């Protein structure tokens, strides 16, 4: 029988809330939930609680919302919970060493990649962009480095050719909670010793998943069709891959791409040239192969299948014309 652990949970979005729900339903005790202060949201800029706070309130769990942990009073407040362990999932705040060392078993983190690959802020997006065939979650012991701590447990899943960041996020949100509970089962054993179980990361194999910037969404047709397809999938639901269409009179429109597919093309059209436009989609030449745009979004409109857009805008997508790179 597992000895229940007293846990401080720190996390913010729905992804974190799904992990918190698994802990609430486990044999362990959640002594407090930490999340950032409420933020203005919506048109009315009303202060809105994050997903983890709402779940904690629903289950009568104490909620703490420090701005950061630079304040000694906040550090002491956390220590008063006398937690066995702190679980961190998409929290968004840096933890100083005094916090990392406060719980008896330290702090563990659920990271959205198989470490040491894709350390950093955007592991899901970067794994898609790179064309990885597998990804997963790693439960690691946190240290003062960026995702450099020893690995306790990992779980893998396949990346399908149709996966987007949104669908892969859901896969990991289903994978992570089980991996987390299994990790806590290991750590709750009376004879658990990190030195006998944890595995150090090989820094030479590490890659960095830098935070996404909205400027990356601007498609450059000098990439191959395969590379562009991966970028489109990686940038859903944000920032969404985009290109600019220029009308004959010079007016520009920014269009977003929500679905596309790679096609074989062995012609010599310049990259960015429309080589086909029909109910199947708008096919654009690249440096290698062609990209068929299947679902796009016009400015101020909802995303639609290309066949529906061509009914009213066929003059925009004439075979032989060129789609511009943004900027």
Curated annotation (Swiss-Prot):
(6S)-5,6,7,8-tetrahydrofolate binds at residues 113-116. It catalyses: L-methionyl-tRNA(fMet) + (6R)-10-formyltetrahydrofolate = N-formyl-L-methionyl-tRNA(fMet) + (6S)-5,6,7,8-tetrahydrofolate + H(+). It is an enzyme of class 2 (transferase). Keywords: Protein biosynthesis, Transferase. Its EC number is 2.1.2.9. Coiled coil: none annotated. InterPro entries: Fmt, Formyl_trans_C, Formyl_trans_C_sf, Formyl_transf_N, Formyl_transf_N_sf, Formyl_transferase-like_C_sf, GART_AS, Met-tRNA-FMT_C. One of its GO terms (cellular component) is cytosol. One of its GO terms (molecular function) is methionyl-tRNA formyltransferase activity. Attaches a formyl group to the free amino group of methionyl-tRNA(fMet). The formyl group appears to play a dual role in the initiator identity of N-formylmethionyl-tRNA by promoting its recognition by IF2 and preventing the misappropriation of this tRNA by the elongation apparatus. Belongs to the Fmt family. This is Methionyl-tRNA formyltransferase. It comes from Colwellia psychrerythraea (strain 34H / ATCC BAA-681).
